[in-house]
Amino acid sequence: MAYGPWNQEQIDAAREVAFPILLGHLGAYYKLDPHFQPLDVSRCSQRVQVAYQGRDFRFIFTGRKFVNELLPADALQRGGGGAIDFVRHLTGYNFVQAVKVCLDALADAADAS
């Protein structure tokens, strides 16, 4: 099944883009919380403070999954899994726009290295 102009391989690649690459591409300010201690150290979770377009966020990233800690625990779409969901949460973009942002960020990162 095709989603927009991309094939499944491209969409899978878009989902895997790391959050620092996306945040840099979007021009967001972010910093890791050096005092964060995850409940389960083996899961390698990180807390990240993000400022984007005048809004503040506090995310917990565990692998591809994320949770916005500043939203109430029972809020719908408080978190998600993968870079596409993350871009949609942060920017309010739709799926097609979010995939494009992820792929553009991936291309920019490849060009920079």
What is the role of each PLM region?
Residues M1-S113:
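N-terminal structured subdomain of primase-like DNA metabolism proteins
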